[in-house]
Curated annotation (Swiss-Prot):
PROSITE patterns: VWFA (PS50234)
UniProt-listed PANTHER family: CALCIUM-ACTIVATED CHLORIDE CHANNEL REGULATOR, ZINC FINGER (C3HC4-TYPE RING FINGER) FAMILY PROTEIN
Cross-referenced InterPro entries: CLCR (IPR051266), VWF_A (IPR002035), vWFA_dom_sf (IPR036465)
Domain VWFA residue range list: 43-215
Protein name: Uncharacterized protein sll0103
């Protein structure tokens, strides 16, 4: 398994007469499988809400979806299951999947009762998942349908960081319309995972399978971007680095002396992690300049090796006295993706502050950006919600969650999930 890394600037040329210039840097990184590479062993922890509001079809559907995932695990994989209401309990201790019948019975016995304390479930999930993480792809699927009424949201966010420190990826799944998208998104972002919205119980199985497929396609783990810039190049001070694919989120930069470091988490073999960096460049003399270099530090569970380094990849730019722009289409697409996310964030902030007209205007702007990207489904949702606000209607909880989801991803038309 190897690193596949590419760098693209928004404009490869620079005006020699400009005192300062701004450029966006697109970094794409993935794991590149060799012919003999096999799927890595998995360490899956399910953290499931079984509070009273999950009674009936919601809990039965989630149990069915969980059992469907377990059927896909192999004997060398490890599984743990945590259930939480206002307390948390271990349903399945971290173990290899060798007694499917006993595991299924334990999950089937879950009943809906009690309140909701997400942080208690996540804490216990981290403890169990950590027991089986050695040389495995370790993911936590955290599902809830409610607000953290008996828990502490700040503690949830700290636990997301703890999971990341333990090299655990956390995917959060919001079930129905009454969960807190700010909290679940922040947990997922801090642990390099994704946020999913299960609007209807019938979507649970498909969503679980999508996440399981993503987990199965991980080739390398615990990846970090290492960026070393020349003295004439600087990262933006505010929000300098964002991920724009597979989903959009802001990433945290840690300064390590001359190196800027960003944790990426898992690297997949079937899709790239794409980052967009905001750079500022001082005036440079005409000619070609190396303005930085990029490396990836990562772990390879297949070989048991950690802290491996990819070959350094130089970042170059051409400085011209007769400046001619040379823009890159792929970088422009990434810029639009991030713009849609930022515009929707501004709209949500305005709506919370009571500025309905301002929110509607920003949603319309985001809808136009989505259309430029070819994201017709996202544009429709954003424009529909803008129109509702303009006509004096309130956005439902479902509307707000759809808005959040389309800001982070490009929605695909629904398709029937495979049974195999």
């Amino acid at each position: 398994m190897r690193i596949d890394l590419s760098l693209l600037l928004s404009d490869q040329n620079l005006d020699a007469g400009a005192p300062t210039s701004q450029r966006q840097l697109r970094i794409a990184v993935a794991a590149k499988a060799d012919d003999h590479d096999r799927r890595l062993p998995l360490n899956l922890c399910l953290v499931l809400d079984h509070s009273g509001s999950m009674d009936g079809q919601p809990l039965e559907t989630v149990k069915s979806a969980a059992l469907g995932l377990i059927d896909r695990l192999e004997e060398d994989d490890r599984l743990s299951v945590i259930a939480f209401d206002h307390r948390a309990k271990i349903v399945i201790e971290n173990q290899q999947v060798r007694n499917g019948a006993a595991i299924a019975k334990a999950i089937e016995r879950l009943k809906a009762e009690g309140g909701t304390a997400i942080d208690e479930g996540l804490k216990l999930g981290i403890q169990e998942a950590a027991k089986g993480k050695e040389d495995r792809v370790s993911h936590i699927f955290l599902l809830t349908d409610g607000e953290n009424e008996h828990g502490d949201n700040d503690r949830c966010l700290k636990l997301g960081t703890v999971a990341s420190d333990y090299k655990l990826t956390v995917h959060t799944l919001g079930f129905g319309d009454h969960w807190n998208q700010d909290v679940l998104e922040a947990i997922a972002a801090s642990a390099q995972g994704s946020l999913s919205y299960i609007e209807n119980p019938s979507e649970a199985l498909h969503t679980f399978r999508q996440l399981f497929q993503r987990m199965s396609n991980v080739g390398l783990t615990n990846a970090h971007l290492l960026l070393e810039l020349a003295p004439q190049a600087h990262l933006a001070i505010v929000k300098p680095v964002a991920q724009v694919s597979p989903e959009t989120m802001d990433l945290t930069v840690q300064n390590q002396g001359a190196i800027e470091e960003v944790r990426l988490g898992d690297l997949m073999t079937d899709q790239e992690r794409v980052l967009l960096l905001n750079l500022y460049l001082d005036q440079l003399l005409p000619g070609q300049h190396v303005i930085g270099q990029v490396q990836i530090r990562y772990d390879d569970p297949a070989s048991g090796q950690t802290n491996l380094l990819s070959d350094p990849l130089p970042l170059t730019i051409q400085v011209q006295t007769q400046y001619q722009p040379s823009t890159d289409v792929q970088v422009q697409e990434s810029i639009l993706t991030l713009a849609k996310y930022r515009q929707t964030q501004i709209a949500e902030t305005k709506l919370k502050a009571g500025d309905r007209q301002g929110a509607a205007t920003m949603l319309q702007t985001a809808a136009k950006t989505a259309l430029q990207m070819g994201d017709k489904n996202g544009a429709t949702i954003l424009q529909t919600n803008a129109t509702r606000l303009q006509s004096g209607e309130d956005l439902s909880e479902g509307d707000r969650k759809k808005t959040r989801m389309v800001s982070k991803t490009t929605l695909q038309p629904p398709s029937a999930p495979s049974e195999h």
